[in-house]
């Protein structure tokens, strides 16, 4: 298994290099530059021009890329021109919020999707199966932002059960009250992300269970008199869980991508909301850093999926 992990980590190096090139040229293709926002009716154009020259914006592109790459490797992704803080400092603060919300969302996703899949597969063609298939189809067809707006309108404004922004209540004092206040604030966005996260897992897991039930080893076990519950728990569920195990890493990175809409609509100060405000404020340093981070997390999710598959499937380790 360690050979699999080491091989995948080594493959990530050229992938990260290609990703950095794409991110750098994406930033170059964007209109304006980091100093365009400083231009105003009372701004001296010569001062802005001096800042551009000092930042090396007129150097050859390969010099700019190597300088940017070297700084990125050392953890220096520049300054946020809107927030007037180092990019890594801002991302570090926001990443904590997104991490905990995504973690809660992943937990809720699997708590919802796995029982739904088992009930639907065990009752194929019956009303239980049709109920969850209908739920899955409706959820797949609803635009996420419409669902988010509906949820926040019902539970945030109409019923006033949950807060509609922030991460903690102003009156929360002490470790325990702050902890529960943070969970309380992330319930709505995490639940909303989990609803859409169940779609893929439900489809994979239900199909996997139905497929495993028709395999020869299941018929052999039944012919030998093995109890149906034992066959289902020890054999069918274990083999059917391989697809969702391999999908685990992509679920995490997918939630981070989906958090862009969720955090913006729910007013949750995480990386997704930061990305939207950076685009509207043309904060180029922050935008490139967040794109690079999201790409890295995508590669990390693929690595995590491979590691999980190597752990649960002996055939991967042998290969």
Curated annotation (Swiss-Prot):
Keywords associated with the record: Cell membrane, Membrane, Peptide transport, Protein transport, Transmembrane, Transmembrane helix, Transport
Stretches that traverse the bilayer: 9-29, 99-119, 137-157, 183-203, 248-268, 289-309
Keyword Membrane (UniProt): yes
Cellular component terms per the entry's GO annotation: plasma membrane
Gene3D superfamilies the UniProt entry points to: MetI-like
GO biological process, one term: protein transport
Domain ABC transmembrane type-1: 95-305
Major place of residence: membrane
InterPro entries in alphabetical order: BPD_transp_1_N (IPR045621), MetI-like (IPR000515), MetI-like_sf (IPR035906)
Topology within the bilayer: Multi-pass membrane protein
Role played: Part of the ABC transporter complex OppABCDF involved in the uptake of oligopeptides. Probably responsible for the translocation of the substrate across the membrane. Essential for uptake of peptides larger than three amino acids and for growth in milk.
Subunit-structure text: The complex is composed of two ATP-binding proteins (OppD and OppF), two transmembrane proteins (OppB and OppC) and a solute-binding protein (OppA).
Protein name listed in UniProt: Oligopeptide transport system permease protein OppB
Organism: Lactococcus lactis subsp. lactis (strain IL1403)
